[in-house]
Amino acid sequence: MWLPLLLGALLWAVLWLLRDRQSLPASDAFIFITGCDSGFGRLLALQLDQKGFQVLAGCLTPSGAEDLQQMASSRLHTTLLDITDPQNVQQVAKWVKTRVGETGLFGLVNNAGVAGIIGPTPWLTQDDFQRVLSVNTLGPIGVTLALLPLLQQARGRVVNITSVLGRIAANGGGYCVSKFGLEAFSDSLRRDMAPFGVQVSIVEPGFFRTPVTNLESLESTLKACWARLPPAIQAHYGEAFLDTYLRVQRRIMNLICDPELTKVTSCLEHALTARHPRTRYSPGWDAKLLWLPASYLPARVVDAVLTWILPRPAQSVS
């Protein structure tokens, strides 16, 4: 009884692998990437440039654009892009249209993102959430909408970089909220654009060593957040809470942050070049073995584990 099932499962796995490895013919198609100053965006831009693609790289800073241009071939072109500025987004969309012409835009990679303040929700303000959402959610939405006609023209692909924290909210702050939002946008966009030949993929990395996970930056922003709190709220938590929270965060980040960014850019490249791109990619051992399995557990179990790991406020009543 079990043998036919095992053989069927094995056959399905082999066919899936063969299908997954089918690639499109070598191409010099246009790919637009946001957030190319550093991290995944910069590495992907150089990776695709070496493969012969015509990369259009959006950078936030002139220094980031200049540095990338010096490392790349003459095929790669940079432009300054602040995805939180709708006017700038429209200007860049016109620049992209001029570059791609009648060919259209084959690939859009929404990579730009920020961490914001990672910490207890009662410490935060609405502006704290707004700043992160404007970059991580509303920014990619604006860029995508501006470039959809060019993507439809080429029957291209949209690849949105979210996070495993878009599947499980492991901490407070706007980051998880923003990534959940981008996941939802990506799912609806995939269904809405399928009739027009535009494919949408989501890449949900685990923890990698990028500017978003820079410990010095995360710790300094949380300390500044603590310093502005009213004395009453500080008293609820106690001075020891902040020190313990930072220590736990440091220990976790040092343990699970992966330095091999190519694990992510390989998924991004597959989403752009595979004949049958996946709906979702989960690069990183922690994504596959920790965060995604945890996202399917009962909320009570996840809450209990996270409560056990993180410090308790001084005036906790439970």
Curated annotation (Swiss-Prot):
InterPro entries: NAD(P)-bd_dom_sf, SDR_fam. The lineage of its organism: Eukaryota, Metazoa, Chordata, Craniata, Vertebrata. The last 8 amino acids of the C-terminal tail are important for a proper localization as well as for the in vivo enzymatic activity. Gene3D superfamilies: NAD(P)-binding Rossmann-like Domain. GO terms for molecular function: 11-cis-retinol dehydrogenase; all-trans-retinol dehydrogenase (NAD+) activity; androstan-3-alpha,17-beta-diol dehydrogenase (NAD+) activity; androsterone dehydrogenase [NAD(P)+] activity; protein homodimerization activity. This is Retinol dehydrogenase 5. It comes from the Eukaryota. Expressed in eye, liver, kidney, brain, intestine, placenta, epididymus and submaxillary gland. In eye, strongly expressed in the retinal pigment epithelium, with lower expression levels detected in the inner segment of the photoreceptor cells and in the outer plexiform layer. In kidney, strong expression detected in the distal tubules and the transitional epithelium in the renal pelvis, with weaker expression detected in the epithelium of the outer stripe of the outer zone of the medulla. In liver, detected in hepatocytes in the centrilobular area. It is a multi-pass membrane protein. Inhibited by 9-cis-, 13-cis- and all-trans-retinoic acids, with the most potent inhibitor being 13-cis-retinoic acid. Weakly inhibited by oleic acid. Signal peptide: none annotated. Disruption phenotype: Mutant mice develop normally and are fertile. No abnormalities can be found in the retinal structure, rhodopsin content and fundus appearance of their eyes. Mice display a mild visual phenotype of impaired dark adaptation and accumulation of 11-cis- and 13-cis-retinols and 11-cis- and 13-cis-retinyl esters in the eyes. It is an enzyme of class 1 (oxidoreductase). The gene is Rdh5. One of its GO terms (biological process) is steroid metabolic process. It comes from Mus musculus (Mouse). NADP(+) binds at residues 32-56.
